[in-house]
Amino acid sequence: MIALALPAQDSGEFNPPGIEEMHLPAILPWGAADGFSKQMLLVILSVVIIATFFLLAARKQQLVPGKLQFAGEAAYGFVRNSIAKDIIGGKDFMKYVPLLFSLFFFILVNNIYGAIPLIQLPSFSHVGGAYVLAAIVYLTWIAIGVKKNGIKYFKLATVPTGVPVYILPIVIPIEIISNFLVRPVTHSLRLFATMLAGHLIVMIAGSGIEYLVMQENILLKGTSVLVLVGAIAMYMLEALIMALQAYVFTLLTAIYIEGALHADSH
């Protein structure tokens, strides 16, 4: 991906990569599939990778698990216990483990693409994918709330308990905007913006290193070493953030579900 950004033109000026580098052309030769880009291919590949791994991990279950079975059980246990059970709790949490499990590993794999050489493109550096996931969570949250509480859920979600009546005209519009308008937008943009910004910084650093190495000035060539060290540190930090964002997105989903299930007690 970094190689897509050519830093030097004939004028010798440094031209850093921009957001447009994230919008790749279609990878198929015919016009009927103009929307099928590298991101779409990676998304499909992520489903295959996740399904293959967990099918293999669960294929031959043993009392004393092998390495693959142990890894699969540990991955499942992390989402089940550390997110679903801890946040949702009660007897209802198991219903939502498949959703949370799928979200976590789908986001994780698509984010980790950005740290893999030759791929180096997190799928959610394009906002479309993040919007789709946030929409799924948003509709699920509303459906759970309505199923649990009926149509009065919309009142429970917008009229906080214990608030003086004279303050409600101010609080209710804020709650409506916060819960039904801002929530899905921030849920998606948090993932998209983090992936875009982190990867863009790494791209700029890579382009800067190439530009500095090509200069005749020895001081500029030496500076490229410092930029390289910084780029490596940023690369490692971005890999950590990739995993963290998968956790944060899934954790917020669990919090929304818990809120829908227990809206009458909030």
Curated annotation (Swiss-Prot):
Keyword annotations of the record: ATP synthesis, Cell membrane, CF(0), Hydrogen ion transport, Ion transport, Membrane, Transmembrane, Transmembrane helix, Transport
Annotated TM spans: 38-58, 99-119, 126-146, 162-182, 191-211, 224-244
CDD domains the UniProt entry points to: ATP-synt_Fo_a_6 (cd00310)
Gene3D superfamilies reported in the protein's UniProt record: ATP synthase, F0 complex, subunit A
InterPro entries: ATP_synth_F0_asu, ATP_synth_F0_asu_bact/mt, F0_ATP_A_sf
GO molecular function: proton-transporting ATP synthase activity, rotational mechanism
Gene Ontology cellular component terms for the protein in this record: plasma membrane; proton-transporting ATP synthase complex
Matching Pfam families: ATP-synt_A (PF00119)
Compartmental location: Cell membrane
Topological relation to the membrane, as annotated: Multi-pass membrane protein
Domain of life: Bacteria
Tagged with keyword Methyltransferase: no
Family the entry assigns: Belongs to the ATPase A chain family.
Subunit structure: F-type ATPases have 2 components, CF(1) - the catalytic core - and CF(0) - the membrane proton channel. CF(1) has five subunits: alpha(3), beta(3), gamma(1), delta(1), epsilon(1). CF(0) has three main subunits: a(1), b(2) and c(9-12). The alpha and beta chains form an alternating ring which encloses part of the gamma chain. CF(1) is attached to CF(0) by a central stalk formed by the gamma and epsilon chains, while a peripheral stalk is formed by the delta and b chains.
Function noted in UniProt: Key component of the proton channel; it plays a direct role in the translocation of protons across the membrane.
Protein name as annotated: ATP synthase subunit a
Organism this protein belongs to: Arthrobacter sp. (strain FB24)
